[in-house]
């Protein structure tokens, strides 16, 4: 089997050994498998366990953006991602419990910034699975705008059938349905993130997670 994130964190493979090319020439990935769930347990007794990923990714400087996709929980793996990242992109479903979890997540990020990674900042809050036809989605959007306007991105990812179908075909939305409304929304997001990062000359290491 091909090696991935688990082997990288366990010190069994280098970044070069686990990096894979994709159909998109400028996009490379480091895959993960179900065995990554075991890494959390194995890292518990490791010295400086919250910085294992940072050490593993040392020397990566040929990429403009490094995006770490995190699970919707604040466990040790997510903490490792926070320790190595310059900024955090927070995707938030337009649902009630996600709104509740957002305040808790932002408080946690402040603690991480204070104790582990002083360079960490919030890149923005991204509203996802938005359906303007529902009252709840509109209410959640209004609440985020009211209380977290400094962080709220202009880009919004709508609820879209093509976006839902793409993973089952093993393709990113740009290859599966590049002219769909869902694809257009991600293009706008990419433009917004690039525009916001132009003043930062460092290689950009961001992570995504979930507010709830």
Question: Where are these predicted regions, by residue range?
Answer:
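P-loop NTP-binding core
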Residues: 1-212
């Amino acid at each position: 089997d091909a090696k991935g994130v688990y082997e990288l964190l366990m010190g069994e493979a280098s970044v070069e050994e686990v990096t894979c090319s994709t159909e998109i020439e400028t996009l490379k990935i480091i895959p993960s498998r179900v065995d990554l769930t075991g890494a959390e347990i194995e890292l518990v007794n490791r010295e400086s366990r919250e910085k294992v990923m940072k050490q593993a990714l040392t020397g990566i400087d040929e990429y403009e953006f490094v995006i770490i996709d995190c699970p919707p929980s604040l466990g040790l793996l997510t903490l490792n991602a926070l320790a190595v990242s310059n900024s955090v992109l927070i995707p938030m479903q337009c649902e009630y419990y996600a709104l509740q979890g957002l305040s808790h997540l932002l408080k946690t990020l402040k603690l991480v910034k204070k104790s582990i990674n002083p360079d960490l900042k919030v890149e923005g809050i991204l509203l996802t699975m938005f359906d303007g036809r529902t009252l709840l989605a509109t209410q959640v959007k209004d609440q985020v705008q009211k209380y977290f306007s400094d962080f709220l991105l202009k880009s919004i990812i709508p609820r879209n059938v093509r976006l839902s179908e793409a993973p089952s075909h093993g393709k990113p939305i740009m290859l599966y349905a590049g002219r769909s409304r869902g694809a257009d929304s991600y293009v706008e997001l990419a433009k917004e993130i690039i525009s916001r990062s132009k003043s930062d000359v460092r290689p950009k290491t961001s992570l995504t997670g979930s507010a709830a």
